[in-house]
Amino acid sequence: MESKSVLLDRELKNVCLEKGEKLAVVTINRPKALNALTSETLRELDYVIEDLENDNDLYCVILTGSGEKSFVAGADIAEMKDLNAKEAEEFGLLGNRVFRRLEKLDKPVIAAISGFALGGGCELAMSCDIRIASEKARFAQPEVGLGIIPGFGGTQRLARLVGAGKAKELIYTGSMIKADEALNIGLVNKVVPLENLMEEAKAMATLIASNAPIAIELSKYAIDRGLQVDIDRAIEIEAEDFGKCFDSEDQF
């Protein structure tokens, strides 16, 4: 993919956005801090997501972290350590709002994960539709070791991805797992050599983008919405979205 940097109407210090034909790459860009998430970084990511929402020429998005050491090493402890209860709740709500907005984006998002995906980093990856990890990737929800709980949706998304029992084990122990175990438990979709990570992510994104975009959007909606309701309502949602395809420009 030939990419170009996008000049947005505000300066971004911590998040980079590149766009190519039908595809975009979003990079959390704080390598000296292992791409840890500050409130400023979350607000910048929110702004980038807004840009992606409004770009109808994009069909798929790749989200990654700068450098090989870390996808995102969690929320920035330097910012969190002095928060009181109310401030911490507001920080958690900010992260959850941004991650939920990413999750609800009308385009598929692929997380390309190298190095650490810890705490908020693991939660960010879980907010994406598909996760591709390098062999060097490491995953954990280690918050209990700091006397807190996952605050950006980890208690909910991890259980939905790997089952309640395994999620409780990982959260209660704070244990770090390697990429191959993450694959075995269903936390990631694919594990590849580090040098092939972005190539694999772009290949999958290109394949997705080669399909009908409205059908992809409706498929995402049907899956995500259906998981939140009972099976009878979920089937109705699928039927409704199936019908919408026949009024779209994509159909046949």
Which ranges hold each PLM region?
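C-terminal alpha-helix plus adjacent terminal tail
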Residues: 1-21, 55-56, 68, 174-180, ...
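Hydrophobic alpha-helical membrane-association signature
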Residues: 41-44, 91-94, 124, 197, ...
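Glycine- (often His-adjacent) and acidic-residue-rich active-site loop
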Residues: 4, 57, 65-101, 117, ...
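Catalytic-core regions built around general acid/base machinery
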Residues: 48, 94-106, 112
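Residues at secondary-structure transition points
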Residues: 32, 36, 43, 75, ...
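Terminal peptide-recognition signature
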Residues: 26, 30, 45, 63, ...
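Conserved CoA-thioester-binding segment of acyl-CoA-metabolizing enzymes
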Residues: 1-64, 100
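Crotonase-fold acyl-CoA enzyme core
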Residues: 103-216, 248
